[in-house]
Amino acid sequence: MLVLVINSMKASHLILGTQRETPSDAEVISHQLMIRAGLIRQVSSRIYNWLPIGKKVLQKVENIIRNEMNNAGAQEILMPMVQPASLWEESGRIDQYGQELLVFLDRHDNKFCLGPTHEEIITDLCKNLLTSYKQLPVTLYQIQTKFRDEIRPRFGVMRSREFLMKDAYSFDLDQESLDSSYQIMKNAYIKIFDSIGLDYRIVKADSGAIGGSDSEEFHVLAESGEDLLAFSDKSSYAINAELLTELQDEQDPFSLEGKSSPDVKGILKLKRGIEVGHIFKLGKKYSEVLNLRIQGEDTDIYPEMGCYGIGASRIVAAAIEQNHDEKGIIWPDALTPFQVALVEVNPKNKDEIKNKSLEVYNLLKENSIDVLWDDRDKRPGVKFTDMEVIGIPITVIIGDRTLEKNEIEIKRRVDEQPELVAHQDLIASIGLR
């Protein structure tokens, strides 16, 4: 069960960090709006601090992921970001990753690396944890910071050097059991992205440096996406367009548009996507090379492994790419940092307005509505601009004009005109209970 945490507060107590100017180096809208809305601040080249509003959204992503992982029977652990380089040498991936793997020496000249992924560590861990086939199948996961020394970090947190990721690893007795674990994780991913409210596609993909056999990617559709996707307009068929070489004219993936889908169900459409999840059937690649042996019924076996990753911080950026307008972010309901903004405007009688605002603030909290009370001594235009760029879906406005009539003004983020409601009808009109 996903627990809703209500964290209402006053804007005067919150480090908002909003900005009016768009950073000159921000190429895509998600990067621009994450800076302007005060979600992140850059520390170094594509390494970011997450400010209170951003951390609140990121935590909502984590909670949705954690909830579905737990529902799928996966068990949460936490592995170190710093890994012995010897494990990467043993698996052979230290050369494969090259300079993207940040390697360093400790004071005793022992070689370590900052983990971009954790296949080696989890396999080494399970040498001691898993001893018998009776413990299988099992899936372990973590939500952990990763580091990849990208040659061209760009697009804000969409392709940053440090990022937050959920990675899970399944261990199975045989291929049939792996197929089952893989499907369970795939179904969990579908629930995660459906819960968040993203328009996405599941596409056949290349396993890349992770290795293994079958793999699929989850892509959020957005013009800023770096991958070109080809998918049927009549079925669930979808693939990274670069992999569909046999249908391309002169090795041009854009030539796929309008051709018959390989599953003979519909016509191929092309759109760009942002990869936010990737699932793999690793087979015995890591269990064999790192010598993870488990006692079987008759003899020792190398377990079949699966690997399942979700970019938690990238989801935040992808959601913004898909949900914004000229004023700022329009969050999916599941990710909005606050459900309601409470704004005081033009008070002639400050005490009366303050008391009314406090009354409404407490009423919203009593009804389990997450509210940000903008009690700052700022002009109304500044307050409304901040609430719009942050993307709070509903603004409740308390002012002298409405106070005289015992009414409250409600402005929805996606509507042009506000509505006036009686005080006693506020909660029903908001419709969030």
Stretches found by the model and what they are:
Residues 2-433:
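NTP/phosphate- and nucleic-acid-binding module
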